[in-house]
């Protein structure tokens, strides 16, 4: 089944569940996907959409919630905070008790604040926000609150594991350079890379923050990196800022390895080709990392959606697996859904995903799960973007090993 057909079928099923639940005595659980479904960043939003439909479909196949199918509502946030704010209002007006989103930390910052303020004004009718992929540290730091949960990594998790994995393999070296986009995510990455240097055992000899998606020629930046004589380049860059940086590095003959967070974004390997070989990424999934369990998940995901899970999809699926496990321990009171009870259940839930143990830290609502450090290689079983390259895992960290400490800036007020 193609992704397009799968998505259309998912929307049709959601519409049918809306009609079928109309006469039910129990209040239906409505989950609103508020994602970037159009415009230049829609490719990532559609990946989240596929993951949500896949896993909520699994939950519905198993009986849904309280004997009713979970209803899936969709809203296009058009890639920006303003659009997201409008769509969150519409979703709540349509009866959604839970908002899910993941493709932008800027959008996530808007949604989490809107949800927080709404909940302050509407005691007893609180809305949950399940963050599937927005990784800015502040979301579980200064902006943390009881009704927000993050199911993805953050800068601290990604760059601690990628550095330690490379160190353990003997490919990190001693001299490192940090180059990142100049906004909250890039600053988070730079701060993490600097903070980890002494403990893991490398020196950050220089660092650069640059404009986001405006630079066409990274040659001057690469010349600076080359002059620094480094072994590893840490970068949280994504999209063209990653591709153009790596192409400029290859053209200049730079020998340093790139330690990245988003090298697995669809299209990257197809565009970079041999340039990407040997470079590193740390993510929550690799189909070869956990034997039959991880490969079986990859094959089932492809069977349902038409493509292997990649980039943001696995983390979203695994987070919603935890959510589904939590729902098993929640019983609606007098036919009404209590989102506070659902939040408490998520805090106490644990599940075995295709990658291993997955749980939620109650202090700040940062999920805890394994991370896989992997390199671009021809030896990978599953290839990326129709090329001869894929991602070959060489180090897996448990959730306990991966997770970062609770940030001092998180002061979560609990209900009651």
UniProtKB/Swiss-Prot annotation:
Domain of life: Bacteria
Keyword Thylakoid recorded: no
The keyword Transport is annotated on this UniProt entry: yes
Keywords tagged on the record: Amino-acid transport, Signal, Transport
BP GO annotations: amino acid transport
One Pfam family from the record: Peripla_BP_6
Gene3D superfamilies named among the record's database cross-references: 3.40.50.2300
CDD domains, per database record: PBP1_SBP-like (cd06329)
Signal peptide (residue range): 1-26
Family named by the database record: Belongs to the leucine-binding protein family.
Function: Component of an amino-acid transport system.
Protein name: Leu/Ile/Val-binding protein homolog 4
